[in-house]
Amino acid sequence: MKRWDRGGRPQFNEFNITEHAESTDHPDDIWNTIHNQVIQAVKDVSNRYMEEVGCQQQWPYSNALEQVRLKHYQVDQNDRFDEHADVGDHASARRFLAMFFYLNDVEKGGETKFEHRSIKPVQGRCLAFPPMWMFPHSGAAPITEDKYIIGTYLHYV
């Protein structure tokens, strides 16, 4: 795990699942298995998103998945991610859909907050949203238990 501690912009531990899966020679490695499961989940969530939003005709024909990352927000470190947009420079401008897969319930705190909505972390759920400047959000510090998510982005190719 790599520690990010920029005083809330961001502040959490991160493990790059894609990097690890691509660096192993063992196809039955647990991280390869997890990586493949996440890829399938991204496809399923993308299809549901297109149906619910009604954007099948506008969906980018050519797209790819950014690296898959496990993020750990610790209660005792006041880990959080203050308000930001996930597209903020040329390198991130190809992102068009963010996905956060919640791996555990957090009783208090840990919400992903948008201007008019707050999403509570619930195990097994996925939050998908456009990562552009029109959707600034924050990751509140968990209060009762650590928060674990797997995050990735779909991007243009």
Predicted regions, residues:
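Fe(II)/2-oxoglutarate oxygenase catalytic core
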Residues: 1-126, 134-157
